[in-house]
Regions:
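Amphipathic alpha-helical polymerization modules
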Residues: 1-121
Length: 121
């Protein structure tokens, strides 16, 4: 297999992981005290793409104690998640375009190989 194919395949795996992490962030955006995760990708020649996932510890907004609860059940202020849904939706769109570009690389490689086989036949 060619280096371009391996690189594109590695990128697809990394982008899939990035989509998983972003989807998890969005799914937990309304969970108090949830800390979002961030995916960082690094080129690693010749293996392809290395994925690192880290937690983002910036604080979320603070909510006052729930006044609807009885006084004995009220706690201190609650912290909301630190997820910015708009930012994560933009990340999903960018990831989708990256995914498409890498799929196109694989398709182009396959078409070139097919043409070479047709020439030899």
């Amino acid at each position: 297999m060619s280096e371009a194919f391996n690189a594109a395949l590695s990128a697809l795996r990394a982008l899939s992981r990035k989509m998983d992490v972003t989807a998890n962030n969005i799914a937990n955006s309304q969970t108090n005290n949830f800390k979002k995760s961030r995916v960082e990708m690094e080129d690693v020649y010749p293996a392809g793409v290395k994925v690192s996932i880290s937690q983002v510890n910036t604080p979320g907004d603070m909510l006052p104690p729930d006044e609807a609860l009885p006084p004995e059940e009220r706690t201190q202020n609650l912290e909301t998640s630190n997820v910015n849904i708009a930012e994560d939706l933009v990340n999903l769109i960018v990831t989708e375009h990256d995914f498409s570009a890498n799929i196109k690389t694989i398709q182009t490689k396959n078409e070139m190989e097919k043409q070479l086989i047709d020439i030899k036949v």
